[in-house]
Amino acid sequence: MLTDIEISRQTKHRPITQIAEKFGITSSELVPFGDAKAKVKLSILKRVDDNLEGKLVIVTAVTPTPFGEGKTVTSIGLTQGLNALGKKACACIRQPSMGPVFGIKGGAAGGGYSQVVPMEELNLHLTGDIHAVSSAHNLAAAAIDARLFHESRMTADEYREQSGQAPLNIDPEKILWRRVVDHNERSLRNITVGLGANNGPIHDSGFDITAASELMAILALSLDLKDMRRRIGKLVLALDSLGQPITAETLGVAGAMTVIMSDAIEPTLMQTLTGDPCLIHAGPFANIAHGNSSIIADRIALKLADIVVTEGGFGSDMGFEKFCNIKTRVSGKTPDAAVVVVTLKALKANSGIDSQNDINRPDMARLQVGFANLKWHIDNVSQYGAPVVVAINRFPTDTFEELTWLKAKVLETAAFGCEICEGFSQGAKGAEALARVVVSATEQKSDFKFLYQLDESIESKLLTIAEAGYGAAGIKLSPDAKIQLQEINSMGLDKLAVCVAKTPLSISHEPKVKGVPTDFELPITQLKINAGAGFITALVGKVMTMPGLGIKPGYLNVDINEDDEIVGLA
Protein backbone atom coordinates (compact mmCIF):
# COMPACT_ATOMS: atom_id res chain seq x y z
CA MET A 1 0.00 0.00 0.00
CA LEU A 2 1.15 3.55 -0.67
CA THR A 3 2.39 5.68 2.21
CA ASP A 4 0.13 8.40 3.62
CA ILE A 5 2.08 11.17 1.94
CA GLU A 6 2.06 9.29 -1.40
CA ILE A 7 -1.72 8.87 -1.18
CA SER A 8 -2.08 12.55 -0.33
CA ARG A 9 0.01 13.57 -3.34
CA GLN A 10 -1.73 11.27 -5.81
CA THR A 11 -5.18 12.61 -4.94
CA LYS A 12 -6.36 15.72 -6.71
CA HIS A 13 -7.34 18.31 -4.13
CA ARG A 14 -10.03 20.87 -4.74
CA PRO A 15 -9.25 24.57 -4.25
CA ILE A 16 -10.03 25.48 -0.65
CA THR A 17 -12.37 28.21 -1.88
CA GLN A 18 -14.60 25.52 -3.40
CA ILE A 19 -14.62 23.53 -0.16
CA ALA A 20 -15.60 26.67 1.73
CA GLU A 21 -18.36 27.62 -0.69
CA LYS A 22 -19.91 24.14 -0.60
CA PHE A 23 -19.79 24.17 3.21
CA GLY A 24 -21.46 27.58 3.45
CA ILE A 25 -18.50 29.90 4.09
CA THR A 26 -18.50 33.02 1.90
CA SER A 27 -15.40 34.41 0.19
CA SER A 28 -15.48 37.48 2.46
CA GLU A 29 -15.20 35.17 5.48
CA LEU A 30 -12.14 33.36 4.12
CA VAL A 31 -8.43 34.24 4.23
CA PRO A 32 -6.68 31.76 1.89
CA PHE A 33 -3.12 30.59 2.54
CA GLY A 34 -2.46 29.23 -0.94
CA ASP A 35 -4.88 26.77 -2.57
CA ALA A 36 -5.01 24.15 0.18
CA LYS A 37 -5.88 25.97 3.40
CA ALA A 38 -7.55 29.13 4.63
CA LYS A 39 -8.35 30.95 7.84
CA VAL A 40 -12.03 31.43 8.64
CA LYS A 41 -12.93 34.86 10.02
CA LEU A 42 -14.90 34.97 13.24
CA SER A 43 -17.37 37.35 11.62
CA ILE A 44 -19.06 34.22 10.25
CA LEU A 45 -20.48 33.51 13.71
CA LYS A 46 -22.68 36.60 13.58
CA ARG A 47 -24.04 35.68 10.15
CA VAL A 48 -24.91 32.09 11.06
CA ASP A 49 -26.09 32.81 14.59
CA ASP A 50 -29.73 32.00 13.78
CA ASN A 51 -28.89 28.68 12.11
CA LEU A 52 -29.95 25.51 13.88
CA GLU A 53 -27.11 23.66 15.60
CA GLY A 54 -25.99 20.30 14.28
CA LYS A 55 -25.21 17.19 16.29
CA LEU A 56 -21.84 16.85 18.04
CA VAL A 57 -19.98 13.53 18.08
CA ILE A 58 -16.84 13.13 20.22
CA VAL A 59 -14.36 10.40 19.26
CA THR A 60 -12.20 8.80 21.93
CA ALA A 61 -10.37 5.48 22.31
CA VAL A 62 -9.15 2.68 24.53
CA THR A 63 -5.85 3.03 26.35
CA PRO A 64 -3.21 3.95 23.74
CA THR A 65 -0.53 1.51 22.61
CA PRO A 66 2.63 1.90 20.50
CA PHE A 67 0.78 0.30 17.57
CA GLY A 68 -1.67 3.17 17.11
CA GLU A 69 -5.43 2.95 17.51
CA GLY A 70 -6.36 5.22 14.60
CA LYS A 71 -8.54 7.74 16.40
CA THR A 72 -7.93 10.51 13.86
CA VAL A 73 -8.24 8.03 10.98
CA THR A 74 -11.62 7.05 12.39
CA SER A 75 -12.68 10.67 12.95
CA ILE A 76 -11.84 11.59 9.35
CA GLY A 77 -13.27 8.33 7.99
CA LEU A 78 -16.49 8.86 9.92
CA THR A 79 -16.78 12.38 8.49
CA GLN A 80 -16.26 10.99 4.99
CA GLY A 81 -18.80 8.23 5.62
CA LEU A 82 -21.41 10.65 6.93
CA ASN A 83 -21.05 12.87 3.87
CA ALA A 84 -21.28 9.80 1.62
CA LEU A 85 -24.63 9.01 3.26
CA GLY A 86 -25.92 12.47 2.36
CA LYS A 87 -25.32 14.12 5.71
CA LYS A 88 -23.55 17.47 5.82
CA ALA A 89 -20.62 16.64 8.10
CA CYS A 90 -17.46 18.41 9.21
CA ALA A 91 -14.46 17.27 11.24
CA CYS A 92 -12.87 19.48 13.91
CA ILE A 93 -9.40 18.37 15.00
CA ARG A 94 -6.31 19.79 16.69
CA GLN A 95 -3.26 21.19 14.95
CA PRO A 96 -0.35 18.73 15.23
CA SER A 97 2.73 19.71 17.20
CA MET A 98 6.08 19.31 15.46
CA GLY A 99 7.43 17.68 18.62
CA PRO A 100 5.62 14.36 18.01
CA VAL A 101 5.90 14.79 14.21
CA PHE A 102 9.69 14.59 14.49
CA GLY A 103 9.57 12.31 17.52
CA ILE A 104 8.04 8.86 17.72
CA LYS A 105 4.31 9.45 17.19
CA GLY A 106 4.43 11.07 13.78
CA GLY A 107 1.80 13.38 12.34
CA ALA A 108 -1.86 13.74 13.18
CA ALA A 109 -3.63 14.05 9.84
CA GLY A 110 -5.26 10.63 9.88
CA GLY A 111 -3.91 8.11 7.42
CA GLY A 112 -4.41 6.00 4.34
CA TYR A 113 -7.59 7.03 2.53
CA SER A 114 -8.99 8.81 5.58
CA GLN A 115 -6.71 11.77 6.05
CA VAL A 116 -6.62 15.55 5.88
CA VAL A 117 -4.70 16.83 2.88
CA PRO A 118 -2.13 18.02 2.06
CA MET A 119 -0.87 16.15 5.10
CA GLU A 120 2.57 17.77 5.03
CA GLU A 121 1.04 21.24 5.27
CA LEU A 122 -1.11 20.20 8.22
CA ASN A 123 1.78 18.56 10.08
CA LEU A 124 4.33 21.33 9.44
CA HIS A 125 3.47 24.89 10.54
CA LEU A 126 -0.01 25.03 8.95
CA THR A 127 -0.93 28.75 9.23
CA GLY A 128 1.48 29.52 12.05
CA ASP A 129 -0.82 29.34 15.06
CA ILE A 130 1.58 27.31 17.20
CA HIS A 131 4.38 29.77 16.48
CA ALA A 132 2.08 32.62 17.53
CA VAL A 133 1.36 30.84 20.81
CA SER A 134 5.09 30.28 21.36
CA SER A 135 5.91 33.94 20.68
CA ALA A 136 3.17 35.28 22.93
CA HIS A 137 4.13 32.87 25.70
CA ASN A 138 7.82 33.73 25.54
CA LEU A 139 7.06 37.47 25.46
CA ALA A 140 5.50 37.06 28.90
CA ALA A 141 8.61 35.20 30.11
CA ALA A 142 10.84 37.98 28.77
CA ALA A 143 8.63 40.63 30.37
CA ILE A 144 8.85 38.97 33.78
CA ASP A 145 12.64 38.76 33.68
CA ALA A 146 12.96 42.32 32.36
CA ARG A 147 10.79 43.62 35.20
CA LEU A 148 12.74 41.57 37.70
CA PHE A 149 16.04 42.90 36.33
CA HIS A 150 15.07 46.58 36.37
CA GLU A 151 13.49 46.47 39.81
CA SER A 152 16.54 44.70 41.23
CA ARG A 153 19.02 47.39 40.18
CA MET A 154 17.31 50.41 41.77
CA THR A 155 15.26 51.45 44.75
CA ALA A 156 11.49 51.39 44.70
CA ASP A 157 11.33 55.19 44.44
CA GLU A 158 13.86 55.24 41.60
CA TYR A 159 11.93 52.58 39.71
CA ARG A 160 8.65 54.41 40.22
CA GLU A 161 10.17 57.68 39.03
CA GLN A 162 11.88 56.25 35.94
CA SER A 163 9.17 53.81 34.81
CA GLY A 164 6.03 55.53 35.99
CA GLN A 165 4.93 52.19 37.50
CA ALA A 166 4.80 50.81 41.01
CA PRO A 167 7.30 48.01 41.74
CA LEU A 168 5.81 44.52 41.63
CA ASN A 169 8.41 42.97 43.97
CA ILE A 170 8.49 39.69 42.07
CA ASP A 171 9.83 36.78 44.10
CA PRO A 172 12.53 35.16 41.87
CA GLU A 173 11.82 31.81 43.51
CA LYS A 174 8.11 32.06 42.72
CA ILE A 175 8.19 32.67 38.97
CA LEU A 176 5.60 30.22 37.67
CA TRP A 177 5.84 31.05 33.96
CA ARG A 178 8.39 28.97 32.05
CA ARG A 179 9.33 29.16 28.38
CA VAL A 180 8.06 27.03 25.49
CA VAL A 181 9.27 25.61 22.18
CA ASP A 182 7.48 23.34 19.70
CA HIS A 183 10.00 20.49 19.87
CA ASN A 184 10.79 17.52 22.10
CA GLU A 185 13.88 18.71 24.01
CA ARG A 186 14.52 17.06 27.37
CA SER A 187 17.73 19.06 27.98
CA LEU A 188 15.62 22.22 28.37
CA ARG A 189 13.31 20.84 31.05
CA ASN A 190 15.25 22.61 33.77
CA ILE A 191 17.54 25.59 33.16
CA THR A 192 19.07 28.51 35.03
CA VAL A 193 18.56 32.00 33.60
CA GLY A 194 20.20 35.33 34.36
CA LEU A 195 23.80 34.07 34.29
CA GLY A 196 26.54 36.57 33.46
CA ALA A 197 27.05 40.21 34.38
CA ASN A 198 23.98 42.45 34.09
CA ASN A 199 21.67 39.58 33.09
CA GLY A 200 20.23 38.69 36.49
CA PRO A 201 18.83 38.05 38.94
CA ILE A 202 19.70 34.39 38.54
CA HIS A 203 16.78 32.00 38.98
CA ASP A 204 15.61 28.57 37.91
CA SER A 205 13.36 28.18 34.89
CA GLY A 206 12.77 25.68 32.10
CA PHE A 207 10.98 24.92 28.87
CA ASP A 208 7.73 23.11 28.19
CA ILE A 209 6.48 22.03 24.78
CA THR A 210 4.19 24.70 23.29
CA ALA A 211 1.19 22.35 23.38
CA ALA A 212 1.46 22.47 27.19
CA SER A 213 1.31 26.27 27.31
CA GLU A 214 -1.67 27.72 29.11
CA LEU A 215 -2.03 30.00 26.10
CA MET A 216 -2.75 26.96 23.94
CA ALA A 217 -5.54 25.98 26.32
CA ILE A 218 -6.84 29.55 26.26
CA LEU A 219 -6.85 29.51 22.45
CA ALA A 220 -8.89 26.32 22.50
CA LEU A 221 -11.35 27.52 25.16
CA SER A 222 -11.92 31.15 24.12
CA LEU A 223 -15.31 32.13 22.73
CA ASP A 224 -14.03 35.16 20.80
CA LEU A 225 -11.16 37.68 20.73
CA LYS A 226 -12.46 39.66 23.73
CA ASP A 227 -12.78 36.48 25.76
CA MET A 228 -9.22 35.51 24.81
CA ARG A 229 -7.99 38.96 25.90
CA ARG A 230 -9.79 38.59 29.22
CA ARG A 231 -8.36 35.13 29.81
CA ILE A 232 -4.81 36.17 28.94
CA GLY A 233 -5.08 39.02 31.45
CA LYS A 234 -5.86 36.47 34.20
CA LEU A 235 -2.70 34.40 33.61
CA VAL A 236 -0.81 34.02 36.89
CA LEU A 237 2.84 34.48 35.94
CA ALA A 238 4.51 34.74 39.34
CA LEU A 239 4.00 35.56 43.00
CA ASP A 240 5.29 38.66 44.75
CA SER A 241 7.28 38.80 47.97
CA LEU A 242 4.02 38.60 49.96
CA GLY A 243 2.79 35.57 48.04
CA GLN A 244 0.20 37.49 46.02
CA PRO A 245 -0.38 36.62 42.34
CA ILE A 246 1.17 38.71 39.57
CA THR A 247 -0.93 38.40 36.43
CA ALA A 248 -0.25 39.24 32.80
CA GLU A 249 -2.63 42.17 33.30
CA THR A 250 -0.63 43.41 36.28
CA LEU A 251 2.60 43.09 34.32
CA GLY A 252 1.06 45.03 31.44
CA VAL A 253 1.85 42.38 28.82
CA ALA A 254 -1.62 40.89 28.26
CA GLY A 255 -2.55 43.25 25.44
CA ALA A 256 0.61 42.57 23.45
CA MET A 257 0.22 38.82 23.95
CA THR A 258 -3.32 39.01 22.61
CA VAL A 259 -2.19 40.98 19.56
CA ILE A 260 0.41 38.31 18.74
CA MET A 261 -2.35 35.68 18.86
CA SER A 262 -5.07 37.75 17.18
CA ASP A 263 -4.85 35.82 13.90
CA ALA A 264 -4.38 32.49 15.67
CA ILE A 265 -7.90 32.72 17.08
CA GLU A 266 -9.26 32.03 13.59
CA PRO A 267 -9.55 28.29 12.75
CA THR A 268 -8.02 26.88 9.58
CA LEU A 269 -10.13 25.16 6.94
CA MET A 270 -8.72 22.15 5.08
CA GLN A 271 -10.24 19.09 3.40
CA THR A 272 -10.25 15.32 3.52
CA LEU A 273 -9.18 13.18 0.55
CA THR A 274 -12.82 13.17 -0.57
CA GLY A 275 -13.26 16.93 -0.29
CA ASP A 276 -15.05 17.04 3.05
CA PRO A 277 -14.49 20.12 5.26
CA CYS A 278 -12.19 19.92 8.25
CA LEU A 279 -11.52 22.74 10.71
CA ILE A 280 -8.15 22.61 12.45
CA HIS A 281 -7.65 24.77 15.50
CA ALA A 282 -5.48 24.72 18.64
CA GLY A 283 -3.33 21.83 19.80
CA PRO A 284 -3.29 21.16 23.55
CA PHE A 285 -2.02 17.68 24.43
CA ALA A 286 -4.45 15.51 26.39
CA ASN A 287 -1.89 14.10 28.82
CA ILE A 288 -0.42 17.45 29.96
CA ALA A 289 -3.27 19.79 28.98
CA HIS A 290 -6.99 19.44 28.22
CA GLY A 291 -6.48 17.78 24.83
CA ASN A 292 -9.27 19.09 22.61
CA SER A 293 -9.60 21.34 19.57
CA SER A 294 -11.21 24.75 19.87
CA ILE A 295 -14.69 25.77 20.90
CA ILE A 296 -14.66 28.38 18.12
CA ALA A 297 -14.13 25.73 15.43
CA ASP A 298 -16.95 23.64 16.90
CA ARG A 299 -19.30 26.65 17.01
CA ILE A 300 -18.68 27.48 13.36
CA ALA A 301 -19.05 23.86 12.25
CA LEU A 302 -22.18 23.24 14.31
CA LYS A 303 -23.94 26.18 12.64
CA LEU A 304 -23.09 24.89 9.16
CA ALA A 305 -23.22 21.09 9.44
CA ASP A 306 -25.74 18.40 10.32
CA ILE A 307 -23.11 16.47 12.26
CA VAL A 308 -19.73 17.62 13.60
CA VAL A 309 -17.07 15.03 14.45
CA THR A 310 -14.38 16.05 16.91
CA GLU A 311 -11.94 14.06 19.02
CA GLY A 312 -10.30 14.10 22.43
CA GLY A 313 -6.67 13.06 22.77
CA PHE A 314 -5.55 9.61 23.98
CA GLY A 315 -8.01 7.35 25.83
CA SER A 316 -11.36 8.22 27.39
CA ASP A 317 -9.68 8.74 30.76
CA MET A 318 -7.75 11.65 29.23
CA GLY A 319 -9.13 13.80 26.41
CA PHE A 320 -12.74 12.64 26.71
CA GLU A 321 -12.91 13.30 30.45
CA LYS A 322 -11.52 16.81 29.88
CA PHE A 323 -13.86 17.37 26.94
CA CYS A 324 -16.77 16.69 29.27
CA ASN A 325 -15.61 18.39 32.44
CA ILE A 326 -13.66 21.34 30.99
CA LYS A 327 -14.55 22.12 27.37
CA THR A 328 -18.28 21.40 27.62
CA ARG A 329 -18.67 23.65 30.68
CA VAL A 330 -17.35 26.58 28.64
CA SER A 331 -19.01 25.83 25.30
CA GLY A 332 -22.37 24.80 26.70
CA LYS A 333 -22.61 22.17 23.94
CA THR A 334 -22.86 18.61 25.21
CA PRO A 335 -22.09 15.57 23.01
CA ASP A 336 -24.95 13.86 21.21
CA ALA A 337 -22.92 10.65 20.86
CA ALA A 338 -19.48 9.29 21.63
CA VAL A 339 -17.35 6.90 19.59
CA VAL A 340 -14.77 4.66 21.28
CA VAL A 341 -12.08 3.47 18.86
CA VAL A 342 -10.50 0.08 19.42
CA THR A 343 -8.25 -2.31 17.51
CA LEU A 344 -7.51 -5.98 18.01
CA LYS A 345 -3.88 -4.98 18.50
CA ALA A 346 -4.85 -2.59 21.30
CA LEU A 347 -6.74 -5.30 23.16
CA LYS A 348 -3.84 -7.73 22.85
CA ALA A 349 -1.39 -5.04 23.96
CA ASN A 350 -3.58 -4.25 26.96
CA SER A 351 -3.43 -7.92 27.87
CA GLY A 352 0.33 -7.68 28.26
CA ILE A 353 1.75 -8.47 24.78
CA ASP A 354 4.34 -6.03 23.51
CA SER A 355 5.90 -7.96 20.62
CA GLN A 356 4.87 -6.87 17.10
CA ASN A 357 4.79 -10.50 15.92
CA ASP A 358 2.63 -11.62 18.83
CA ILE A 359 0.29 -8.67 18.31
CA ASN A 360 -0.35 -9.67 14.68
CA ARG A 361 -0.94 -13.34 15.52
CA PRO A 362 -4.55 -14.47 16.15
CA ASP A 363 -5.01 -15.07 19.87
CA MET A 364 -8.55 -15.31 21.25
CA ALA A 365 -7.31 -15.86 24.78
CA ARG A 366 -5.39 -12.58 24.75
CA LEU A 367 -8.35 -10.77 23.23
CA GLN A 368 -10.57 -11.95 26.06
CA VAL A 369 -8.10 -10.64 28.64
CA GLY A 370 -7.63 -7.34 26.83
CA PHE A 371 -11.36 -6.85 26.35
CA ALA A 372 -11.58 -5.71 29.96
CA ASN A 373 -9.84 -2.49 28.95
CA LEU A 374 -12.40 -1.77 26.23
CA LYS A 375 -15.31 -2.52 28.55
CA TRP A 376 -13.82 -0.14 31.11
CA HIS A 377 -13.69 2.65 28.54
CA ILE A 378 -17.25 1.93 27.36
CA ASP A 379 -18.48 2.15 30.96
CA ASN A 380 -16.37 5.24 31.60
CA VAL A 381 -17.87 7.09 28.62
CA SER A 382 -21.38 5.82 29.38
CA GLN A 383 -21.42 7.44 32.82
CA TYR A 384 -21.54 10.87 31.13
CA GLY A 385 -24.89 10.03 29.54
CA ALA A 386 -24.23 10.12 25.79
CA PRO A 387 -24.89 7.03 23.60
CA VAL A 388 -21.67 5.09 22.97
CA VAL A 389 -20.68 3.56 19.64
CA VAL A 390 -17.61 1.32 19.39
CA ALA A 391 -15.60 1.60 16.18
CA ILE A 392 -13.31 -1.35 15.45
CA ASN A 393 -10.51 0.09 13.33
CA ARG A 394 -9.59 -2.84 11.11
CA PHE A 395 -6.01 -3.84 10.27
CA PRO A 396 -5.04 -6.22 7.40
CA THR A 397 -3.87 -8.85 9.90
CA ASP A 398 -7.24 -9.00 11.70
CA THR A 399 -9.11 -12.27 11.26
CA PHE A 400 -12.83 -12.65 10.63
CA GLU A 401 -13.18 -14.87 13.70
CA GLU A 402 -11.58 -12.26 15.98
CA LEU A 403 -13.61 -9.38 14.56
CA THR A 404 -16.88 -11.32 14.79
CA TRP A 405 -16.17 -12.27 18.39
CA LEU A 406 -15.28 -8.71 19.37
CA LYS A 407 -18.33 -7.16 17.76
CA ALA A 408 -20.64 -9.64 19.49
CA LYS A 409 -18.88 -9.08 22.81
CA VAL A 410 -19.26 -5.30 22.55
CA LEU A 411 -23.00 -5.65 22.00
CA GLU A 412 -23.23 -7.34 25.42
CA THR A 413 -22.00 -4.12 27.07
CA ALA A 414 -23.58 -0.70 27.63
CA ALA A 415 -22.61 0.37 24.10
CA PHE A 416 -25.42 1.52 21.80
CA GLY A 417 -23.78 -0.12 18.81
CA CYS A 418 -20.58 -1.41 17.25
CA GLU A 419 -19.25 -1.43 13.72
CA ILE A 420 -16.03 -2.25 11.89
CA CYS A 421 -14.41 0.76 10.25
CA GLU A 422 -12.13 0.43 7.22
CA GLY A 423 -11.60 4.10 6.47
CA PHE A 424 -7.83 3.68 6.30
CA SER A 425 -7.98 1.25 3.37
CA GLN A 426 -11.26 2.27 1.73
CA GLY A 427 -11.98 5.88 2.72
CA ALA A 428 -15.64 6.92 2.81
CA LYS A 429 -16.92 3.52 1.64
CA GLY A 430 -15.14 1.75 4.49
CA ALA A 431 -16.73 4.05 7.07
CA GLU A 432 -20.34 4.13 5.84
CA ALA A 433 -21.46 1.29 8.10
CA LEU A 434 -20.02 3.08 11.14
CA ALA A 435 -21.62 6.33 10.00
CA ARG A 436 -25.08 4.71 9.91
CA VAL A 437 -24.75 3.52 13.50
CA VAL A 438 -23.48 6.93 14.62
CA VAL A 439 -26.41 8.70 12.95
CA SER A 440 -28.78 6.40 14.84
CA ALA A 441 -26.92 7.10 18.08
CA THR A 442 -27.26 10.87 17.66
CA GLU A 443 -31.02 10.41 17.33
CA GLN A 444 -31.20 8.85 20.80
CA LYS A 445 -31.72 10.88 23.96
CA SER A 446 -28.47 12.11 25.48
CA ASP A 447 -28.71 12.61 29.24
CA PHE A 448 -25.37 14.34 29.77
CA LYS A 449 -23.96 14.89 33.25
CA PHE A 450 -20.69 16.25 34.62
CA LEU A 451 -18.46 14.11 36.80
CA TYR A 452 -18.18 16.82 39.47
CA GLN A 453 -19.52 20.29 40.31
CA LEU A 454 -17.32 23.39 40.28
CA ASP A 455 -18.37 24.46 43.78
CA GLU A 456 -16.70 21.38 45.25
CA SER A 457 -13.22 21.73 46.76
CA ILE A 458 -10.14 20.98 44.67
CA GLU A 459 -9.51 17.85 46.74
CA SER A 460 -13.08 16.66 46.24
CA LYS A 461 -12.87 17.18 42.47
CA LEU A 462 -9.54 15.36 42.32
CA LEU A 463 -10.93 12.48 44.36
CA THR A 464 -13.96 12.18 42.08
CA ILE A 465 -11.81 12.12 38.93
CA ALA A 466 -9.47 9.57 40.53
CA GLU A 467 -12.23 7.24 41.70
CA ALA A 468 -14.92 7.64 39.03
CA GLY A 469 -12.61 8.60 36.15
CA TYR A 470 -9.69 6.20 36.72
CA GLY A 471 -10.96 3.60 39.17
CA ALA A 472 -8.44 4.63 41.83
CA ALA A 473 -8.87 3.88 45.51
CA GLY A 474 -7.99 7.44 46.48
CA ILE A 475 -5.50 10.29 46.09
CA LYS A 476 -2.32 11.30 47.87
CA LEU A 477 -0.99 14.86 47.76
CA SER A 478 2.76 15.44 47.98
CA PRO A 479 4.07 18.05 50.49
CA ASP A 480 4.54 20.50 47.60
CA ALA A 481 1.01 19.88 46.35
CA LYS A 482 -0.40 20.53 49.82
CA ILE A 483 1.36 23.91 49.98
CA GLN A 484 0.18 24.75 46.48
CA LEU A 485 -3.36 23.79 47.44
CA GLN A 486 -3.24 26.26 50.33
CA GLU A 487 -2.04 28.99 47.94
CA ILE A 488 -4.83 28.17 45.48
CA ASN A 489 -7.45 28.32 48.24
CA SER A 490 -6.08 31.61 49.60
CA MET A 491 -6.35 33.17 46.13
CA GLY A 492 -9.98 32.08 45.82
CA LEU A 493 -9.26 29.84 42.83
CA ASP A 494 -10.60 26.64 44.38
CA LYS A 495 -13.80 26.71 42.30
CA LEU A 496 -11.97 26.23 39.00
CA ALA A 497 -12.18 22.97 37.04
CA VAL A 498 -9.41 20.38 37.42
CA CYS A 499 -7.17 19.12 34.61
CA VAL A 500 -5.17 16.01 35.50
CA ALA A 501 -1.81 15.61 33.77
CA LYS A 502 -0.74 11.97 33.80
CA THR A 503 0.60 9.21 31.59
CA PRO A 504 -1.80 8.26 28.76
CA LEU A 505 -0.35 4.75 28.55
CA SER A 506 -2.35 3.40 31.48
CA ILE A 507 -5.62 4.22 33.17
CA SER A 508 -3.49 4.59 36.29
CA HIS A 509 -0.38 6.75 36.81
CA GLU A 510 1.95 3.83 36.09
CA PRO A 511 2.59 3.54 32.32
CA LYS A 512 3.53 -0.14 32.50
CA VAL A 513 0.32 -1.20 34.24
CA LYS A 514 -2.00 -2.33 31.45
CA GLY A 515 -5.58 -3.54 31.28
CA VAL A 516 -7.76 -2.26 34.12
CA PRO A 517 -5.64 -1.26 37.13
CA THR A 518 -7.29 -1.47 40.56
CA ASP A 519 -6.46 -0.70 44.19
CA PHE A 520 -4.06 2.13 43.39
CA GLU A 521 -3.69 5.56 44.96
CA LEU A 522 -3.27 8.51 42.59
CA PRO A 523 -0.16 10.50 43.61
CA ILE A 524 -0.61 14.28 43.08
CA THR A 525 2.91 15.74 42.86
CA GLN A 526 2.11 19.35 41.92
CA LEU A 527 -0.84 21.70 41.49
CA LYS A 528 -0.44 24.43 38.88
CA ILE A 529 -2.64 27.50 38.56
CA ASN A 530 -4.13 28.03 35.10
CA ALA A 531 -6.51 30.85 35.96
CA GLY A 532 -6.68 32.11 32.37
CA ALA A 533 -7.67 28.72 31.01
CA GLY A 534 -10.01 28.26 33.94
CA PHE A 535 -8.59 25.15 35.58
CA ILE A 536 -6.06 23.85 38.07
CA THR A 537 -3.62 21.36 36.57
CA ALA A 538 -2.76 18.43 38.82
CA LEU A 539 0.50 16.73 37.87
CA VAL A 540 0.37 13.02 38.64
CA GLY A 541 3.32 10.67 39.07
CA LYS A 542 6.28 11.30 36.78
CA VAL A 543 4.46 13.11 33.97
CA MET A 544 6.63 15.54 31.98
CA THR A 545 5.48 18.77 30.33
CA MET A 546 8.44 18.63 27.94
CA PRO A 547 8.87 15.36 25.99
CA GLY A 548 12.22 14.02 24.86
CA LEU A 549 13.31 12.46 21.57
CA GLY A 550 13.68 8.69 21.43
CA ILE A 551 16.56 6.62 20.12
CA LYS A 552 14.91 6.41 16.67
CA PRO A 553 13.27 9.81 16.19
CA GLY A 554 11.00 10.47 13.24
CA TYR A 555 13.17 13.25 11.83
CA LEU A 556 15.64 10.61 10.61
CA ASN A 557 13.17 9.71 7.85
CA VAL A 558 12.29 13.25 6.73
CA ASP A 559 14.02 14.82 3.74
CA ILE A 560 13.59 16.38 0.31
CA ASN A 561 13.72 14.08 -2.75
CA GLU A 562 15.09 14.77 -6.24
CA ASP A 563 11.81 16.44 -7.22
CA ASP A 564 12.05 18.83 -4.23
CA GLU A 565 9.16 17.03 -2.52
CA ILE A 566 8.97 16.29 1.18
CA VAL A 567 9.41 12.59 1.98
CA GLY A 568 9.35 10.55 5.16
CA LEU A 569 6.51 12.20 7.05
CA ALA A 570 4.26 9.64 8.73
UniProtKB/Swiss-Prot annotation:
Record GO biological process: tetrahydrofolate interconversion
UniProt name for this protein: Formate--tetrahydrofolate ligase
Pfam families xref list: FTHFS (PF01268)
One GO MF term: ATP binding
NCBIfam families: PRK13505.1, PRK13506.1
The keyword Nucleotide-binding belongs to this UniProt entry's keyword annotation: yes
Entry binding sites for ATP: T65, P66, F67, G68, E69, G70, K71, T72
Database matches in CDD domains: FTHFS
EC number: 6.3.4.3
Recorded metabolic or biological pathway in which this protein acts: One-carbon metabolism; tetrahydrofolate interconversion
Cross-referenced PROSITE patterns: FTHFS_1
Family: Belongs to the formate--tetrahydrofolate ligase family.
Highest taxon listed in the record's lineage: Bacteria
Gene3D superfamilies named in the record: Domain 2, N(10)-formyltetrahydrofolate synthetase, Formyltetrahydrofolate synthetase, domain 3, P-loop containing nucleotide triphosphate hydrolases
HAMAP family reported in the protein's UniProt record: FTHFS (MF_01543)
Keyword annotations of the record: ATP-binding, Ligase, Nucleotide-binding, One-carbon metabolism
Catalytic activity as recorded in UniProt: (6S)-5,6,7,8-tetrahydrofolate + formate + ATP = (6R)-10-formyltetrahydrofolate + ADP + phosphate
Provenance organism: Shewanella sediminis (strain HAW-EB3)
